Curated annotation (Swiss-Prot):
Designated name of the protein: Probable cobyric acid synthase
Keyword presence, ATP-binding: no
Active site: C319, H419
GO molecular function annotations of the record: ABC-type vitamin B12 transporter activity; catalytic activity
Cited HAMAP family: CobQ
Assigned protein family: Belongs to the CobB/CobQ family. CobQ subfamily.
Function comment: Catalyzes amidations at positions B, D, E, and G on adenosylcobyrinic A,C-diamide. NH(2) groups are provided by glutamine, and one molecule of ATP is hydrogenolyzed for each amidation.
Lineage: Archaea, Methanobacteriati, Thermoplasmatota, Thermoplasmata, Thermoplasmatales
NCBIfam families per UniProt: cobQ (TIGR00313), PRK00784.1 (NF001989)
Highest taxon, organism lineage: Archaea
GO BP term, pick one: cobalamin biosynthetic process
Amino acid sequence: MKMIQVLGTSSDSGKSTLATAFCRILKDLGYRVSPFKAVNMSLNSIAIKDGSEIARAQWVQAMAAGAEPSAYMNPVLLKPEGHHKSQVIILGRSIGSMGINDYYNYINKNAKIIKESIDFLSNKYDVIISEGAGSPAEINLAGRDFANIYVSSLYNTPAILVADIDRGGVFASIYGTINLMQRSDLLKYYIINKMRGDQSLLYPGIERIEELTGKKCLGIVPYIDLKLPGEDSLDYNFSGSGSIGIVRYPYMENYSDFDPLIFNEKAFYIKNKEDLKRCDVIILPGSKDVFHDLEYINSNGIADSIKRCSGEKMIIGICGGYQMLGKRINDASGVESDGVSIPGLGLLDIETYYNKTKTTGSVKYRFAENQLKINGSGTGYEIHYGSIVKNNEMPLLITDHGPEGSVSSNGMVIGTNVHGILENNEFYRYITGEYLDYDNIIENSIETLAGIVKKSINIEGFLELLNDA
């Protein structure tokens, strides 16, 4: 089995991006490649063809590798819910919410899931590019970190350390990580990522790191402005200047729904009711805690301001945001609340009911005949507990399972449970007036990324790691 582990000095150092680049580089060289991340904590997930839920980062990496996305590529997905709990998803299926201690007890007993996933992928692919999580030097998590050195140690996998120079202190972070991490003998190279300016300024530091640690620099990768989905909320701290406002509530999830708008600088975050004056279109995104987020926008005046905008501005709700637009949200089973029933914004004549069975899966659809007069079809995915049981509006879509979504009588309020709807060229054009080829943007970004990384690293040294794997 050949596997290379991509570790980082910190979160957001560029592990996901470089793992994506490595997947495409090896694919172009003729290898059958699979991405892998043992444990990912992210609210940016996607439901793949078989209904499994995985992190969107591994989905992008699979695209770069030319591989069919699989739950084995991300066997453990943690989706923070607040209140010190996360929804735990094992091999694509939710097993419920857990606090940190319950999760560690579970994963300690079931760590074999990680090894079994690697073994499954190794039987199908030539090379696995395994991405770590956070940093391998979190000494407070020694013995409980199953995303980094645990994976490397299973098969003595060679590792590359990614360090972000853009945030400063790059040599201190490299030196400190190497000296604090377990099994530093498996670390073969490090990469300095996100470099701006003259690279020669780094050479004395690179020489000194080699003297102190014996570790060589595999390359210096420049800062690259890419149009690729981010892994978590850290990747979505943008301030746009467009006319489409996205309501930013505390438990917002599936940020990647808005990549098409962000890529073209069409969107900004609505953080208070005054921001609503700037936009022509208001979008309520998905939420990991619909009840809390609805209370949040009620308490700060955003909800009342949205109601006053009804009929003047287009209002779109996706998943949890769609539920908020309805008349009522009922959770007698206590899935996301204490078993309460609360009023929504009342802009759509629908009611949502929660049950303990989670709906996940890819969706094929065509646009329904309604006031919007949008033609075309597409694919998306659903990830939700709440079901729209009462819907007295015209549907937005027609899926294999029947009508889906809602469109108000005046066509100004739209709701859907289908994520990825903004990636549809016709829907994007309807709300922006412009054309978008989302798939082509992603593919071109992956190609650009792989080309720059290949030129920036010692490619021979990288390929030699396959002999050590």
